[in-house]
Every structure is written in structure tokens, then in C-alpha cells.
């Protein structure tokens, strides 16, 4: 039995086969999360891209828990230089871990580490979506992305049980595009994410799920979960 929980912004926790996996663990400074970094126990971290609101507390969590960080190659290299145990991957590649199978898909966005103090931007590779499969169940975390037509292909090739889609607009697709994305990927359940963390991405998630067709839409508050 797999338990999938949402923890605000784009933070998703998966519990399966006695393992805990965190996706995009932006905890410190996240006004929408219920988690505190110092309390989190995790076996693996999966990152969609290098922006601060997704990498978040990765370095501290990985070191404190001796957790592996699965990330696009350049981002994994960047984090490895900081003493983190990483497993680099790239778009289209998949790997079987002891906690489940991870495959990276396309995402249309950016990926960089921004050092505000020194006013520098470090390239951290291509952004990715994440397909996670364990116990014959598949979770799709779209990462930060625009709508793109190959979402149809993702839906054709994968039997997706639950999909987390960004709806905040401005930096990612907004609700209207996310409704079309949900139609294309054909997930059984769709959960909105990446909204209401900052004023510029304020959205009504309940209006979004009401517009969904041919799938179940579910708004998860921070800490709520779905059992697959």
C-alpha cells in the first residue's frame, strides 16, 4: 500500500515498502507547509529542478538522513559538490531503486541556482517531471511546467494513478492549461499544486477541480494524503 501526501507548494511525500521519499522539499520559508525540516525522516529525495522553492532543504535533509538525492545530472553534480549523496539522471531515463522506479519526463521551465548575495546564477540543467512507480502504482509529479503536447504521450505510455499538476500561473501553467493537461495525461486522480504560496500565484484550487473531466480532482491541504 502506497501513501501519497501533499505538504504545500510542490512538496509531495511518498511512503511505500517501508521507505519515505520526498519530492521538491521546500520546507523552510514555505508558508504553506506543515513540515519542519528538523523533524523529517527521509530515505530519498527527488528533485524536479534547481530553483530554490524546489531544492529547498535538500542539502540538510540529505546529510541528516544519509538520503540519496535523485536529480537531473547538472543539479546532482552541483549538490554533490556540497557533500550530498546523489544519483544523477536525465530526461527520458529511468532507474530502479530499492524504494521504487524513477523516470524523468520533459518539463518546460528553467533550472538554476540563484545566489542573491553574490548576484550570480548557476545553470543546473534541464527541468523535469517525475514518474514514480512502486507497488504497481504510478505517481506523476509534473514539476514546474507549461502545458506541452507530449503530455499526451506521457498519458499514453503510463497508467497514472495520481498526478500533481501546477496551477499557479505566471511561472507555470495556470488552471485552464492544467485542465487540458489533466485530460491529456489521463490520470485517475489529479491534485493541484504550486499555488497560493506567494501572491503572484494565487488561485482557487476548488474551481480548478470542478472543471476537470474524465478524472477525479482532489484538493489536498498540507498533510492530507491519498492511499493507493
From Swiss-Prot:
Pfam families attached to this UniProt entry: Lactamase_B_2
Coiled-coil parts of chain: none
Keyword vocabulary terms for this entry: Hydrolase
Entry-linked InterPro entries: Metallo-B-lactamas (IPR001279), RibonucZ/Hydroxyglut_hydro (IPR036866), UPF0173 (IPR022877), UPF0173_UPF0282_UlaG_hydrolase (IPR050114)
Keyword Flavoprotein: no
Keyword 4Fe-4S: no
Highest taxon above the source species: Bacteria
Gene Ontology molecular function, alphabetical: hydrolase activity
SUPFAM superfamilies xref list: Metallo-hydrolase/oxidoreductase
UniProt family annotation: Belongs to the UPF0173 family.
Alphabetical list of NCBIfam families matching this protein: PRK00685.1 (NF001911)
Protein name per Swiss-Prot or TrEMBL: UPF0173 metal-dependent hydrolase BcerKBAB4_4442
Organism of derivation: Bacillus mycoides (strain KBAB4) (Bacillus weihenstephanensis)
Lineage start: Bacteria, Bacillati, Bacillota, Bacilli, Bacillales
